[in-house]
């Protein structure tokens, strides 16, 4: 990842050097906090939006695009000004529906860092209909601005007029808002407990079937994922995808996975088979499943 980032940001430029130094200090995690953003903007006389635009090729470098070879980068800006990178993640030898779109990637990245509201989405290509619908699930969706290289300051709803969303199904819950499904993490195995805690933070008001993922890496790091459901159903993002996406954006290698646990309360649907199918194309590590 380090070499790819340096190729993406030529190091004969002072701004790029400063960005690389920030990323190196955090082990190449695709994230810049508010203080880092403000320091870069101050030192190089940039607006927040101009910095985000400059970072789009860097965000896109976190992509895995074995199918399309078309890298999309996105940056979700949180309400306090943090930058969350996102990139499209494709999975060869599996169903195309397993794909993570760049905007989904950035939003789920923000969610797993406990962001509560996205104010802006900066992306290098016009959002597809799938992503427009996914963003419409967000807390504060009516206030989100979309910024493209050729067109800035566009309200999300200008891309999705007469939108269908949670309110049409009489649902008050929104993605990124605090969630609690009263799941108790009291297992003797800590990794199982982390999967349960992730499931407890799922956004699943349509099926009421939360599930979470916990991945243990060989260096003892743990990455978790939560289920993000959508009013339109198909743009929903399973917990395995949010976990894998977070791993990719934090420069984790899937070859270093030691264990993978899923905890699920399968009331109306289950993601167990879908997760096992995807994992079989990525690793020899088998899914450990716990029904709640």
Swiss-Prot record:
Keyword terms, alphabetized: Hydrolase, Metal-binding, Zinc
Protein residues bound to Zn(2+): 101, 128, 131
InterPro entries, per the entry: APOBEC/CMP_deaminase_Zn-bd (IPR016192), CMP_dCMP_dom (IPR002125), Cyd/dCyd_deaminase_Zn-bd (IPR013171), Cyt/Deoxycyt_deaminase (IPR050202), Cyt_deam_dimer (IPR006263), Cytidine_deaminase-like (IPR016193), Cytidine_deaminase_bacteria (IPR020797)
Cofactor details (free text): Binds 1 zinc ion.
A GO term, aspect molecular function: cytidine deaminase activity
NCBIfam families given in the database record: cyt_deam_dimer, PRK09027.1
Cofactor annotation: Zn(2+)
Entry's Gene Ontology BP terms: cytidine deamination
Protein's UniProt name: Cytidine deaminase
Entry binding sites for substrate: 88-90
EC number(s) on file: 3.5.4.5
Native organism: Haemophilus influenzae (strain ATCC 51907 / DSM 11121 / KW20 / Rd)
PANTHER family hit by this protein: CYTIDINE DEAMINASE
Reactions catalysed according to its record: cytidine + H2O + H(+) = uridine + NH4(+); 2'-deoxycytidine + H2O + H(+) = 2'-deoxyuridine + NH4(+)
């Amino acid at each position: 990842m380090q070499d790819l980032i340096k190729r993406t940001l030529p190091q004969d430029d002072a701004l790029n050097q400063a960005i690389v130094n920030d990323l190196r200090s955090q082990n190449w995690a695709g994230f810049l906090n508010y203080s880092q953003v403000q320091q870069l903007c101050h030192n190089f006389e940039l607006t927040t939006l101009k910095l985000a635009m400059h970072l789009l090729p860097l965000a896109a470098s976190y992509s895995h695009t074995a199918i399309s070879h078309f890298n999309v980068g996105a940056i979700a800006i949180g309400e306090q000004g943090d930058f969350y990178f996102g990139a499209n993640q494709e999975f060869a030898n599996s169903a195309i529906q397993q794909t993570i779109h760049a905007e989904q990637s950035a939003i789920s990245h923000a969610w797993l860092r406990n962001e509560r509201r996205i104010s802006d989405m900066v992306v290098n290509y016009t959002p597809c209909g799938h992503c427009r619908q996914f963003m419409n699930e967000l807390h504060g969706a009516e206030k989100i601005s979309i910024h493209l290289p050729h067109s800035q300051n566009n309200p999300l709803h200008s891309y999705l007029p007469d939108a269908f969303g949670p309110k049409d199904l009489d649902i008050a819950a929104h993605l990124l808002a605090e969630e609690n499904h009263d799941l108790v993490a009291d297992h003797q195995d800590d990794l199982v407990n982390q999967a349960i805690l992730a499931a407890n933070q799922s956004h699943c008001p349509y099926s009421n079937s939360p599930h979470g993922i916990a991945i243990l890496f060989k260096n003892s790091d743990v990455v978790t994922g939560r289920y993000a459901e959508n009013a339109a159903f198909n743009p929903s993002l399973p917990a395995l995808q949010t976990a894998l996406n977070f791993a990719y954006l934090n420069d984790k290698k899937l070859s270093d996975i030691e264990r993978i646990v899923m905890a699920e309360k399968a009331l109306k649907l289950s993601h167990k088979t879908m997760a096992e199918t995807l994992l079989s194309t990525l690793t020899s590590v088998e899914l450990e499943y716990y029904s709640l």
